[in-house]
């Protein structure tokens, strides 16, 4: 079990479906290396790690898989994960959970995780459901549910979030976050006229740029893997929470 930074939080009443089911997704299909059945590999620091840097974009077919190669530098640390675009408009929770699990084990399918999470067409209700499924599949008690009820978050909540990002990534545990992205405060490519309720995974950080690497299963605007400022991440999670 991890060293606890705070006590385990209670469940959040957070709906994690896309605002418009299927809006970010096109026809079904899965990318893979020619003749091998393995997903293409992606290098995450080729264009740097400043906020807004897109690592992968343009692959938005449901089920598309990419192999994200982790790196470790003096300031940055990212993890090896098996990324996959969510297969339905309301499976962001299962897809983000699958990405997180893939850092440590061969993950179940999105459909299997949707069943474990109790995901419906209304989405995945509570971040605590994600926490429980992560721990159950890994046979661990590492993951805890952390609430961020204040919007904007308090400095103590932001400090805890950054500490969780660094601690978890350094121990090979991606975070799963439940976010609310209103117009005017959205990651790249999100529908600018809608408030998006969503789950995505945090799979790395760069301490020098104070950025985090996001694996976003929705593929809004064709953006899959991108660097986001930590400060923006901290404003997207309230009033929901995250599993770390």
Spans of features found by a protein language model:
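Active-site nucleophile-adjacent alpha helix/oxyanion-hole segment immediately C-terminal to the catalytic cysteine
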Residues: 75-122
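Conserved active-site-adjacent core of cysteine acyl-enzyme catalytic domains
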Residues: 22, 27-29, 33-51, 59-65, ...
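ATP/adenylate-binding site constellation spanning eukaryotic-like Ser/Thr protein kinases
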Residues: 11, 94-97, 199
């Amino acid at each position: 079990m991890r060293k606890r930074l705070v006590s385990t939080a209670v469940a959040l009443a957070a709906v994690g479906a896309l605002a418009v089911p299927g809006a970010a997704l096109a026809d079904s299909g899965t990318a893979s290396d020619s003749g091998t059945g393995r997903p293409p590999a992606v290098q995450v620091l080729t264009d740097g790690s400043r906020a807004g840097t897109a690592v992968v974009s343009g692959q938005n077919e449901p089920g598309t898989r990419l192999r994200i190669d982790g790196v470790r530098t003096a300031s940055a640390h990212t993890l090896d994960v098996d990324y996959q675009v969510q297969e339905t408009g309301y499976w962001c929770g299962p897809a983000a959970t699958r990405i997180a699990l893939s850092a440590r084990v061969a993950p179940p399918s999105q459909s299997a995780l949707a069943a474990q999470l109790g995901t419906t067409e209304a989405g995945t209700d509570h971040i605590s459901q994600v926490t429980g499924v992560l721990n159950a599949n890994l046979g661990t008690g590492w993951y805890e549910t952390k609430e961020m009820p204040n919007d904007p978050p308090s400095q103590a909540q932001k400090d805890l979030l950054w500490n969780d990002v660094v601690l978890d990534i350094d121990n090979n545990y991606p975070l799963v976050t439940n976010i609310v992205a209103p117009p005017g405060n959205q990651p790249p490519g999100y529908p600018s006229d809608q408030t998006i309720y969503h789950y995505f995974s945090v799979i790395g950080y760069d301490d020098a740029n104070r950025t985090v690497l996001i694996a976003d299963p929705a593929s809004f605007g064709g953006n899959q893997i991108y660097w986001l400022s930590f400060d923006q991440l901290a404003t997207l999670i309230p009033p929901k929470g995250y599993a770390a």
